[in-house]
Amino acid sequence: MTTIVSVRRNGQVVVGGDGQVSLGNTVMKGNARKVRRLYNGKVLAGFAGGTADAFTLFELFERKLEMHQGHLLKSAVELAKDWRTDRALRKLEAMLIVADEKESLIITGIGDVVQPEEDQILAIGSGGNYALSAARALVENTELSAHEIVEKSLRIAGDICVFTNTNFTIEELPN
C-alpha cells in the first residue's frame, strides 16, 4: 500500500507520501507520485490504495471541484455520494487525503468524509498509523514546521512499514 500524511500548522498545510507501488509482496515501482496538486494548484491530494483506482478518483474529484467552484467539503461529499452509490465506483479500492488553504479531509472507499481532530493531522495507508503517531508527537513536542513534520513522519513510517519507502513527494500550500 503506502503512507500519506497531512499536517496543518502555522498557516501552512503540507501533504506528503512515499513512492512505493507494490503488487502483493513485490515492489513494482519505487518512485510513484501519489501526492498531486489539483484545481489550478489550490488543492493538494494524496492517495493510498490501488493506483489506477486512485487516478480515477483524482479525475472525478477534480471534476467535482470544478463543478463546485473549488469548495473542498462540498466536492468531497459529492464524490463520496457517487462513490457509495455508483456500482463501478464502489469497486474502486483507494482512499484520498485532500486539503486546501482552509480545511483537510479524508475521503474513504466506503463513502465517508472525515475531518481531522483538533491537531489537524491526517494519515492513511499501510504506514498511516505510524506516520500519524509520529506527527502527533512532533506537533506536541517540537516547533518544527509542517513540512519538517511530514517528512520526519514519512521517514519513520518508511523505516517500519514494508509497503512504504523513503522516496517522498511533499506538496504544501501557505495560508
Swiss-Prot record:
Its EC number is 3.4.25.2. Belongs to the peptidase T1B family. HslV subfamily. GO terms for biological process: proteolysis involved in protein catabolic process. Na(+) binds at residues 158, 161, 164. One of its GO terms (molecular function) is metal ion binding. Keywords: Allosteric enzyme, Cytoplasm, Hydrolase, Metal-binding, Protease, Sodium, Threonine protease. NCBIfam families: ATP_dep_HslV, PRK05456.1. Protease subunit of a proteasome-like degradation complex believed to be a general protein degrading machinery. It comes from the Bacteria. The lineage of its organism: Bacteria, Pseudomonadati, Pseudomonadota, Gammaproteobacteria, Pasteurellales. The keyword Phosphoprotein does not apply. It is found in: Cytoplasm. Gene3D superfamilies: Glutamine Phosphoribosylpyrophosphate, subunit 1, domain 1. Coiled coil: none annotated. It is an enzyme of class 3 (hydrolase). A double ring-shaped homohexamer of HslV is capped on each side by a ring-shaped HslU homohexamer. The assembly of the HslU/HslV complex is dependent on binding of ATP. Allosterically activated by HslU binding. HAMAP family: HslV. One of its GO terms (cellular component) is HslUV protease complex. Transmembrane segments: none annotated. This is ATP-dependent protease subunit HslV. InterPro entries: ATP-dep_Prtase_HsIV_su, Ntn_hydrolases_N, Proteasome_sua/b, Proteasome_suB-type.
